[in-house]
Amino acid sequence: MDKTLKFTESHEWVRDNGDGTVTIGISEHAQEMLGDVVFVELPEIDAEIDAGDSFSLVESVKAASDIYAPVTGVVIEVNEDLQNSPELINEEPYDGGWIVKVKMSDPDELKDLKDAEEYLASIEED
């Protein structure tokens, strides 16, 4: 796992791209709990998302799960590959399975997220 990633309580990850944008996906732990992903509902480009609000939906053979925005901002890119290959979320949760890229409204929101070590400790308690 990339130690520069930040995580939410609801198992989303955030990669700071260093230019005021972030890439967002779901953690390996989350995809393991979901099982085989069969569909991903992507938001529209230019959609405004608010930290804590649902912006996407991932459906698996077991369940449908809302994906929550870790930060507030505007969607600048969506992972179109997930339309035809939703299994990328299972196969490459931190790489090919990313969901969106967002231009942040307030980069300070990243400070509220867990680092990789804190996140791993929290899921071991589950």
Swiss-Prot record:
Modified sites of kind N6-lipoyllysine: K62
Cofactor: record remark: Binds 1 lipoyl cofactor covalently.
Keywords assigned: Lipoyl
CC annotations in GO: cytosol; glycine cleavage complex
Transmembrane segments annotated in the record for this chain: none
Source organism, top-level taxon: Bacteria
Cofactor: (R)-lipoate
UniProt record, GO biological process: glycine decarboxylation via glycine cleavage system
Chain ranges of the Lipoyl-binding domain: 21-103
KW Manganese (keyword) present: no
Cited HAMAP family: GcvH (MF_00272)
Assembly information from the UniProt record: The glycine cleavage system is composed of four proteins: P, T, L and H.
Family: Belongs to the GcvH family.
Cited function: The glycine cleavage system catalyzes the degradation of glycine. The H protein shuttles the methylamine group of glycine from the P protein to the T protein.
Name of the protein described by the UniProt record: Glycine cleavage system H protein
Species, as recorded: Vibrio cholerae serotype O1 (strain ATCC 39315 / El Tor Inaba N16961)
